[in-house]
Amino acid sequence: MTKIASALAISALACSSALAADPATIDWSKVPVANVTLFYPGQASYEWVRSGSHPGSKMVADGTACGTCHQGKEKAMGDKIVKGGSLEPTPVKGKAGSADLKFQAAYDAKNAYLRFQWKTQLPDPGTEHQYLRFDGKEWKVYGFPKLDKVVQEGKQPGIYEDRMTIMIDDGKVPLFAQQGCWLTCHNGERDMPKQFTKEEVAANALLTAIKKNDVRKYLPASRNDPSDWKTGKTVEEIAKIKADGGFVDLIQWRAHRSNGVGMADDGYVLE
């Protein structure tokens, strides 16, 4: 299995590790390493963790941190979910339910430097992604995400790059420190239960106003009913929330599409 290392530089983030100057000159052997187990959540959404299907739903609704009950149980949970069931209606053969991540952080006067290391779960290098192949007449796409119909039917191989995504909050998003990404994943979003239809998106005032053609991650504060993506607040209301810092930074590193040019996507989650 191939080990992948990713180093990201993020402005104005406080970290409690060794001082650094330039990413290329950091001696990572002197920076403390935190070992974290990541697990596959399937389609466990904001709504699911607050429903009767989740034994800890009342605690979640009361603001209890997920780690209160699940710390140290990540691998077992991921291994169970990935096999299939209500939280994974389309299990992928051979997919691992968890991953071991090594995390390091350093900083200087201007930037924070985050380094992540893990072993790819793919049979090929984690930098592999969709190809264009010439069949003698035309160029055709070869390889698709494993949940795509053509892969599920065996007509195309499942080929997709490794990715590393982090969300960062400065304390202004209620419950994010306790429940993290479960505030952002909702029923109705892409690849989630009750996925949106094109007609629903086209008829939605907020998504039309912000020129979106599908439903992605959002924070509860952006909806009048946090559990209903259709109930978006006005553009003016959301602009006020954003101006007050009520969003989380979303940074995505892609082993194929961004690593080659030494970059990562700089986004955010709110609406």
Question: Where are the language model's segments positioned?
Answer:
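Surface-exposed, glycine/proline- and aromatic-rich loop segments on solvent-exposed faces
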Residues: A96-L270
